[in-house]
């Protein structure tokens, strides 16, 4: 009896949001944020195909920068730079240049190149860690016997 009541209550709870949303006039497919339509804001969304996939925060400019290229070895002339001291590797960032507290859209003369430290990692091989774990377990089992 209690199970039947619990199932009935669950079904009613699942149906309630669907029934209530039919009476609302706004269509979920047509909902947009205000800044997506305002042409005066730098936060206006652009075509997703044109937006770079990888963005990182640059503490120097305080803005989101785009990653350019891969993690590379620092040349000997830059080994003393702050971004090369930690790991010996660097990655290029394309950051907006701030002038008069205005964030500009991307263009050649309004962007600046910065670097950040990175660590050169081997390509991920998820199966190797699992095999090492299992070999360790097998070794422990054999030692116990």
UniProtKB/Swiss-Prot annotation:
Keywords associated with the record: Host cytoplasm, Host nucleus, Secreted, Signal, Virulence
Location in or out of the cell: Secreted; Host nucleus; Host cytoplasm
Signal peptide: 1-20
A Gene Ontology cellular-component term: extracellular region
Positions occupied by motif RxLR: 31-34
Superkingdom assignment: Eukaryota
Record remark: domains: Has the canonical translocation RxLR motif, but lacks the canonical EER motif, which characterizes most oomycete effectors identified so far.
Family, similarity comment: Belongs to the RxLR effector family.
Function recorded in the entry: Secreted effector that completely suppresses the host cell death induced by cell death-inducing proteins.
Protein name in UniProt: Secreted RxLR effector protein 43
């Amino acid at each position: 009896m209690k199970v039947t009541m619990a199932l009935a209550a669950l079904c009613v709870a699942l149906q309630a949001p669907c029934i209530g949303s039919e009476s609302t006039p706004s269509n979920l497919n047509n909902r947009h944020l205000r800044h997506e339509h305002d042409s005066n804001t730098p936060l206006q969304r652009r075509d997703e195909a044109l937006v770079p996939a990888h963005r990182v925060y640059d503490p120097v400019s305080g803005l989101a920068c785009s990653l350019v290229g891969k993690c590379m070895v620092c040349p000997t002339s830059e080994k003393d730079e702050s971004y090369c001291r930690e790991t010996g590797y660097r990655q290029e960032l394309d950051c907006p240049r701030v002038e008069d507290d205005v964030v500009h859209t991307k263009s050649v003369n309004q962007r600046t190149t910065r670097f950040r430290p990175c660590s050169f990692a081997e390509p991920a091989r998820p199966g190797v860690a699992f095999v090492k774990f299992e070999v360790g377990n097998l070794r422990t089992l054999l030692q116990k016997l």
